[in-house]
């Protein structure tokens, strides 16, 4: 769920996106991935593939997989395909001809325990998060917004959006899958990788 930090401002919200004006007009795409069994499997993937070298090494002051763990996983590619099918009519600039125009640069999982935090930072590109569990809110201070995680909820953000959170006070772990989307400089290579993954999933 997405809500305001300061209730004095009014949100301009549509059924699956939200316009927020500050220095520039911001569009946040959101929805729910309604497959709890796949969400559960994503959690297991993260739990079983945490990279000890990444612990507290990045803006994530907690545990995470390596940056590219989910890139070639068929479950993740199916999720991206779901996003394309869901949003290409309303957000054609992003999802139209997606695999020809865009590349998923990184896709990783986070595990946030009590006392862990996320340093406030920005991504230089389009980026998204798929929440796999409930957990502490994601704070977007410049937009006066907070995002309360619910399993299956996803959000796609434009570049340069400051976000983070202070130490989690939850008594349970928070799991999420994060990905960066960049303009495609090598459509052929990514398409080749995608075909190879799909071919493996049918054998």
Report each predicted region and the residues it spans.
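Catalytic core of non-heme Fe(II) oxygenases with the double-stranded beta-helix
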Residues: 96-168, 172-190, 194
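Non-heme Fe(II)/2-oxoglutarate
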Residues: 1-100
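Extended aliphatic helical segments
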Residues: 20-23, 60, 129, 182, ...
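Short, cationic low-complexity segments
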Residues: 197-203
């Amino acid at each position: 769920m997405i809500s305001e930090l300061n209730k004095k401002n009014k949100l301009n919200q549509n059924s699956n996106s939200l316009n927020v004006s500050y220095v520039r007009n911001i569009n946040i795409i959101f929805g729910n991935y309604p497959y709890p069994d796949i969400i559960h499997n994503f959690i297991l993937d993260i739990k079983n593939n945490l990279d000890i070298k990444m612990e507290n090494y990045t803006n994530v002051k907690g545990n995470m997989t390596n940056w590219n763990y989910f890139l070639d996983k068929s479950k993740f590619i199916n999720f991206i395909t779901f996003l394309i099918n869901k949003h290409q009519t309303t957000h054609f600039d992003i999802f139209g001809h997606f695999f020809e125009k865009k590349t998923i640069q990184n896709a990783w999982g986070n595990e946030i325990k009590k006392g862990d935090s996320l340093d406030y930072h920005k991504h230089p590109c389009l980026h998204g998060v798929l929440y796999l569990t409930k957990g502490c809110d994601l704070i977007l201070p410049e937009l006066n917004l907070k995002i309360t995680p619910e399993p299956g909820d996803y959000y796609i953000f434009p570049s340069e959006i400051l976000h983070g959170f202070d130490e989690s006070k939850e008594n349970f772990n928070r799991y999420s899958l994060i990905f960066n989307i960049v303009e495609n400089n090598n459509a052929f290579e990514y398409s080749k990788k995608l075909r190879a993954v799909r071919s493996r999933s049918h054998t």
